């Protein structure tokens, strides 16, 4: 028998705050989390700004001994998972059968800082000086591995790696596993910590990043003057749980996950398909599985990267999937205008925004939106959050390699 699936825990470490609720409050306030890059000297770089996590001290959180054996990417993931598990009430002994608790937490690039540090060490001091922890700190599955160890989660584990769609696919696959009875609950999400010279240089070379040095206007999704995305970092983790399991223990339910679409453009390694067939099909699959009725109040948290190709293609995909009238009636926004592009964490934090929007009836804005683009002609909730009577939400994400994901949610009706 298929199970309904609830979101019962949320956790985040983001450029807007080091907890989920702080992040959500900042989104609703239209706060910009972008600023000058402080992680390294940018004098030789065309890119000057990023959305950095602020005030998170791994040494303080984990202790110096443990922190030095955890890449920042994994530190973010573990901190977010701690918050989500506590929020769900699963940090208490006996709260859940640990053999029925899974972990689906991925990363787009994994422990890149660890890899780069060790490459320099090997080049300067020889191969014998490589850290014995190098491999375990850099491989992308170790966010899931460390979270499973920390929370004694012995159920299904599936670290997902699909670039910018990573944590959307993680949430979607967790939804499927619970729906079909493979777990009672799954910790799902993603993390990234790639604001380092090597990653910024690489993204700059493929012309993905904005070179606008003004933090207040650098990221402007769907605006006619957009010219690239802003790198972000952090983590977001959600606890997905079978509805009956959650209701039986009296858990707080933020929203219900009802549908999931997973497709590929099969078009280009970095560029989205201009005809938007792939993302449109992902949306259509999620809408069909969830029996979504857009006319009843729909919020779409769009991928909205602030690149010329993505934003126009995604707009076309939304209209292709929903039809012109339903697409124009929907509330749309890109919270990347505030968080930057958190790569492997971005899908989960945007699903979190959808869940909170449904629960509170608030649509977070797309900030820095000033000049309309004829190719992007939907209601993008410009610059200020709005109140709305919402029943449904969609979160869409696209990743290098042509990966597309769409997650459909429904407002939870409390009796």
Language model feature labels by segment:
Residues 124-131, 169-172, 176, 192-248, ...:
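Glycine-/small-residue-rich "gating" segment that lines the acyl/pantetheine channel
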Residues 21-26, 112-127, 177-180, 200-213, ...:
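A glycine- and small-aliphatic-rich helix-loop capping segment at beta-alpha/alpha-beta transitions
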Residues 7, 20-23, 28-163, 191-200, ...:
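Conserved beta-ketoacyl condensing-enzyme motif
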Residues 4-8, 31-35, 214-290, 298-299, ...:
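Condensing-enzyme catalytic core mediating Claisen C-C bond formation in acyl metabolism
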Residues 77-90, 140-144, 148-192, 230-251, ...:
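Active-site-proximal alpha-helical scaffold in enzymes
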Residues 1-66, 244-256, 352-366, 410-415:
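ACP-dependent fatty acid/polyketide chain-elongation machinery
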Residues 182-227, 260-274, 304-311, 328-379:
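Acyl-CoA/ACP chain-elongation machinery
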Residues 84-97, 246-253, 283-299, 321-326:
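Phosphate/pyrophosphate-binding loops at sites that engage ATP/ADP/AMP, CoA/4′-phosphopantetheine
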